[in-house]
Amino acid sequence: MKTEDLTAYAKQKESVEKEITSCLLSINNKMEECYSGLSDNYQDFFQNYADMLYKLEIKKEYYSLLLEETEKSDLETIQAYMMDVISTLTQELIEIKIGSSCVGGMKHLAAVLEFEAKLELLVKFTELACNIDI
């Protein structure tokens, strides 16, 4: 690779890492807001924050794993990892959609929240994967 190609490659990898780090920072900040609501009033927490916190926990797990992959891999491997996650998320969304109608109230609520979180992850991971120019 030429020097300018290596520089562009490094900048692109750095850009991907910054995007993921930014998402994790935003998630952590929102989680702190949720936890602060917990100490004030439990009823208010469950009415206004619990669903958001559940979705944030799901997203944090996926972004943390992606950041680990980004720190140790090249762009091609990162993109392949994201495509694998996209495929897995798509399959899980189908399974959640089919299975959520067959469960009780609380499990249904959890399935709906998981569906929403994973749908948002699917969109973001697809966007990130498509922005990698190899």
Label each region the model flagged.
Residues 2-9, 66-84:
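Intrinsic disorder/low-complexity detector
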Residues 8, 12-15, 41, 48, ...:
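Residue preference for a single heptad-register face of alpha-helical coiled-coils
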Residues 9-36, 56-59, 78-98:
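Short amphipathic alpha-helical heptad-repeat segments
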Residues 30-45, 70, 96-103:
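Secondary-structure edge/capping motif, primarily at the C-terminal ends of alpha-helices
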Residues 43-58, 106-120:
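Short, charged, amphipathic alpha-helical segments
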Residues 53-75, 122-133:
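Repeat-associated, polar segments at repeat-unit boundaries in modular proteins
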Residues 90-134:
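Amphipathic alpha-helical binding modules
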